[in-house]
């Protein structure tokens, strides 16, 4: 009966994120084919949210 505790964490050594073609961040998910930083592969517009900047800043 294998648990998901500390010994199992050592097996997590596969490459999940690689460098994104659009933003250059190491956030492009290989299996999902989507960048978690800029949204490349999922949307034509850049990923960004209002909560990422202080309220009132323009």
Curated annotation (Swiss-Prot):
How many cofactor units bind, and how?
Binds 1 zinc ion per subunit.
Keyword tags? Metal-binding, Ribonucleoprotein, Ribosomal protein, RNA-binding, rRNA-binding, Zinc, Zinc-finger
According to the UniProt entry, the coiled-coil residues are none
Q: Where are the transmembrane segments?
A: none
One molecular function GO term is:
zinc ion binding
Cofactor or coenzyme needed:
Zn(2+)
Gene Ontology BP term (one): translation
Instruction: Quote the InterPro entries the UniProt record gives.
Output: Ribosomal_eL37 (IPR001569), Ribosomal_eL37/eL43 (IPR011331), Ribosomal_eL37_CS (IPR018267), Ribosomal_zn-bd (IPR011332)
Metal-binding among keywords: yes
- Functional summary from the UniProt entry: Binds to the 23S rRNA.
In which family does this protein belong, per the annotation? Answer: Belongs to the eukaryotic ribosomal protein eL37 family.
Q: What is this protein called?
A: Large ribosomal subunit protein eL37
């Amino acid at each position: 009966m294998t648990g998901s505790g500390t010994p199992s964490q050592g097996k997590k050594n596969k490459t999940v994120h690689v460098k994104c073609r659009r933003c250059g961040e190491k956030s492009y998910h290989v299996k999902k084919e989507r960048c978690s930083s800029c949204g490349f592969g999922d949307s034509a517009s850049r990923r960004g949210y209002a909560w990422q900047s202080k309220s009132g800043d323009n």
